[in-house]
Structures are given as C-alpha cells and as structure tokens.
C-alpha cells in the first residue's frame, strides 16, 4: 500500500477512535493543567500524596494518538507547570536561574511524552511495563546528568505513605516511582479500553497486584524493623538570618547563640550534639580565636560536637571546602569531612571559562569551593549505659556515622557508600534559609526519608532554619525542632534516641540495579521503535 494512502487510513482511524473516546479524553486542553495541578498537590506543602497515583492520567490521555512532536510539546508544558509549582522557591536565589532550571527539568517530561505516546496507544500489556520504565529511566538520568538534580522525584510524593515506600530498601526511590507510574498507566489504559472488558480486567488486575505485593512487604517490614543499640543525639537549630551569617559584626552574637542552645541541648544528656551547615561564622581551623570558642563550647558540655564550617587548605593554590568537623568531648578535633558533591552555580561554576557570565546574574557571589576527596566516617567512643540492648557491649563503644552536607542527601549512591563503609547512622546538616519560608525544606527532607529506608539507618537532620528532625529506619519523622507550633524559622533544640544498625539492605549492596533494568527496557523500546520505522 502506498505511504500516502496508509497515512490517510491512519488519520481516519484516529478520527473514528476520538469520536468514541470518553468525554474526559476528548476535552484535551484541560488535561495538561489538570496533570500538573494533581502532581503539585501531591508534594509539600499540600502533601496530598494519593493524587500522584492519578496525576499522570490526564497527560497520558492528552498525548494518546498525538504525533510525536505534539506529544513532546504537551508533556513539556506539563513539566513547566509542574516544576513552576514545586521549585518556585529558587526565585529567592535567582529569578533567571529558576526559569532556566524549570525549562531544563521540563525537558524530561517532554522526552517522556515523546517516547511513550506510541506505547500509550498500544493494546498489548507491554505499555504497562514500558511507560513506568521510561519514566524511571528519565528520573535516573535527571538525577545524574550535569552533576544531577534528583529533586521532586515521583517517589518523593509518597514520603508520608510509609507502607508503600518500604520497597525502597530493595529498589530504591526509583522502585516507588515505577509503582506509582504503573498505576497511572493502568488507569489510563482502562479508560482507553473501557469498551473492551478483557483489557480492563488485565491492566487493573496487574497494577493492583503490584500494589498489593508492595503493601504486603511494607506492612511486614514495618513490623520487623532491625534492632540495635541506642544513642541519644541532639540537634541545634540556630535560625541565623542570611544577612547576619557572614557579617563579622554579628560573629560574637552568633557564637553566643549557639553556645546557649548547646548548653540547653546538653541538659538532655545526649551522646552527640549537631550544629547545622556552615553554622560556624568563619574559618574554624584557620582562626585561632574562633576555634578556641567553639572548642570551649564542646569541652564545657562534655559531649562530642559536630559543626558545619568553611575550611581552607593552604598551599600553592588555596582550596576552600564546605566541611563538617567533629570535636571530642575534650574539645579536640577528631575528624573532618569535606563535601564531596558540590552544588553547581552555588558552590562553584562548572566550566568556568564558558559560564563565567552566570555570576553577573546571581544575587550573591557564587562560591569557589573545592570537592572533597574522602568518604569520611566519623568515629567517637561513648561509655556503655542502661540504654544498651547489647549485654556484650564493652565499657567503651565506638560509634560510627557519616555526614551529608546540604543537598548531598538527594544522592542515594553517596548515602549508600557511607553505609557500606560502616556508618551506623547518617547526618544531614544543611542551611535552607536561602529559600525563605517555602516548601523547599520539607521537599528537601523527603530525600532524607528515602535515604533512611533504602539503607535502614536513622537519619538526623540539623538545619539552620529548619527542618531539623529525626528520621527512623521506617522513614518516619519521629521528632523535630518545634517552637509554638512552628518548625521553620525558629530557634531551638531537640534530642531523641536513635538506633544504631549494622544491617546491609539489598539496595545498600546493589544500588540502583532496578533503575538500570528500567533503562534497559526503555532503551530496547526506543531502539525497537526506530528500527520499526526504519523498516516501514
């Protein structure tokens, strides 16, 4: 059959099919904002996580039967609206930067629509596998390409849905994203095949079976959490305004405030006290007077103290680091960790010769930090006490933990590497004051929830302006700094018992193997489409 005649017949079939579609599918212009709206509402501060399970249905309906370029455009528009509603807080740092980030991130929605528009039209069960696999593959690429930005993943919308997210200890956050997208795909295919009850039964049955298995595993895991020794940790939330943070005129005030809050925290008799990222208002190890004051605070309370500070290494070319320093209970420095994963255009300018113009548009100077080189596991000793569940625990117990600075907790491979190096719990110190009183701190904490579940370790967060909290192995926020009902932009302390676990999960050992499988499926599907079109 000539190509022209075949195209005419295909167009006629699409028109006939459109007339028999449900009204919701025929009225496609309203579907794009509907998808974006549902997805935005599933994230903080709304936390209507159940909307994520239907959030992509309108988009899939909208791109069904569309040409590839049309599917790309509609999906890209959905992505623009979604990211405008989720990373809007970047406007507090830079408006041009926020627009650029939104336009870039939306590309992943566009590519998703471009690829799955043909899968969405299939009548075979392959669509139920391909659609979520393509989404997961794109999320993984987004989390790694150009240093990565794994923020607002589909899985993160489920951070408060504890039974569902337990599968992350095997498949990571990407496994949860796959499950949510699979349900979206099944609902879409059900709507599309509403007149064919055989397909209706198959798609929904398959999706519900996946959900049932995940829930069953989640309930089992929630009832069988790993036990271990207890450690009491205290976090300090200084609530230091950005306008004061690096002004030398306020240095004494800032150090004095942290000293008072640390003394307050010590009344809870913790084994470790934690300050936020860059809480020390200067170069701790290079300024003798400042070092003496902070060391004196640690010595006075008699408790190991972890502080965030900029560090500088003198040499032929001075190197600046974003660091975490651990003081022993005697005021002596035990170890230092230098941040491994820097924030591009925040802590450094990548390919500075090409992108030096970016600094002209930044509302504050862009840092020139260097990347750390070591996966540091902090170690300190504590005496055995009545809270130990281990009768064989010696009088001195070595406690091991690692620290993720700022956005490092959005990188699961980094957290898993620390746990593989025998960290018994993780700490995230951060300063989210840059983003104002927005949903950013809550979105940020969602990443820490998944790091806890993936590795079955407790995660302790100390944030300058919040959210400072404790997350257990189940991903539940068990305690937080809160004053007068507010957890953001207040100062305060919180102390809580955490569990030290030595368990290695499947995810800790094997990492993103599930995501790799999804990428293979997605790549095979794309290659199949290209080959098929080439032959035809």
Model-predicted regions and their roles:
Residues 2-221, 437, 451, 463-465, ...:
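Membrane-embedded alpha-helical bundles of multi-pass enzymes
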Residues 220-510:
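Soluble catalytic domains of enzymes that build or remodel membrane lipids, polysaccharides, and related
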């Amino acid at each position: 059959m000539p190509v022209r005649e075949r195209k005419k017949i295909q167009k006629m079939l699409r028109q006939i099919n459109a007339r028999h579609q449900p009204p919701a599918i025929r009225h496609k212009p309203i579907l794009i904002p509907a998808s974006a709206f549902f997805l935005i509402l599933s994230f903080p501060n709304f936390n209507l996580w159940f909307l994520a399970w239907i959030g992509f249905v309108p988009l899939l309906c909208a791109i069904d039967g569309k040409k590839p370029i049309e599917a790309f455009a509609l999906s890209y528009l959905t992505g623009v609206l979604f990211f405008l509603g989720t990373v809007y807080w970047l406007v507090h740092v830079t408006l041009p930067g926020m627009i650029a980030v939104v336009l870039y991130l939306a590309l992943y929605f566009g590519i998703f629509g471009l690829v799955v528009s043909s899968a969405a039209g299939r009548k075979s069960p392959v669509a139920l596998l391909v659609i979520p696999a393509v989404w997961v593959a794109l999320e993984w690429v987004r989390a790694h390409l150009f240093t990565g930005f794994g923020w607002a993943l589909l899985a993160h919308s489920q951070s408060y849905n504890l039974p569902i997210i337990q599968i992350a200890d095997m498949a990571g956050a990407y496994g949860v994203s796959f499950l949510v997208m699979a349900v979206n795909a099944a609902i879409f295919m059900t709507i599309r095949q509403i007149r064919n009850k055989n397909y209706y039964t198959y798609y929904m049955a398959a999706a519900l079976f996946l959900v049932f298995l995940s829930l069953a595993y989640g309930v089992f895991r929630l009832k069988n959490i790993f036990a271990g020794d207890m450690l009491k940790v205290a976090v300090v939330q200084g609530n230091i305004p950005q306008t004061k943070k690096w002004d030398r005129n306020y240095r004494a005030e800032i150090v004095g405030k942290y000293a008072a809050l640390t003394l307050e925290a010590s009344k809870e008799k913790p084994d470790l006290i934690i300050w936020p990222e860059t809480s020390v208002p200067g170069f701790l190890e290079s300024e003798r007077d400042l070092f003496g004051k902070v060391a004196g605070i640690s010595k006075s309370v008699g408790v190991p103290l972890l502080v965030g500070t900029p560090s500088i290494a003198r040499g032929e070319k001075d190197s600046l680091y974003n660091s975490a320093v651990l003081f022993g209970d005697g005021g002596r420095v035990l170890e230092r960790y230098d941040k491994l994963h820097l924030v591009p255009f925040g802590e450094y300018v990548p390919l500075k010769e090409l992108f030096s113009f970016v600094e002209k548009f930044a509302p504050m100077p862009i840092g020139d930090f260097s990347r750390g080189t070591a996966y540091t596991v902090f170690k300190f000793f504590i005496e055995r006490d009545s809270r130990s569940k281990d009768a064989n625990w010696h009088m001195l117990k070595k406690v091991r933990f690692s620290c993720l600075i700022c956005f490092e907790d959005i990188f699961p491979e980094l957290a898993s590497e620390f746990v593989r190096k025998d960290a018994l719990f993780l700490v995230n110190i951060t300063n989210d004051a840059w983003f104002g009183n927005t949903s950013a701190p809550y979105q940020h904490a969602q990443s820490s929830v998944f790091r806890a579940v993936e590795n079955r370790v407790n995660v302790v967060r100390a944030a300058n302006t919040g959210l400072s909290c404790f997350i257990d192995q189940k991903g539940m926020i068990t305690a937080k700094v809160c004053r007068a009902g507010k957890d953001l932009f207040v100062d305060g302390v919180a102390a809580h018992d955490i569990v030290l676990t030595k368990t290695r999960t499947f995810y800790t050992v094997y990492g993103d193997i599930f995501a790799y499988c999804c990428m293979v499926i997605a790549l095979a599907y794309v290659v199949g489409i290209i080959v098929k079109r080439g032959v035809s």
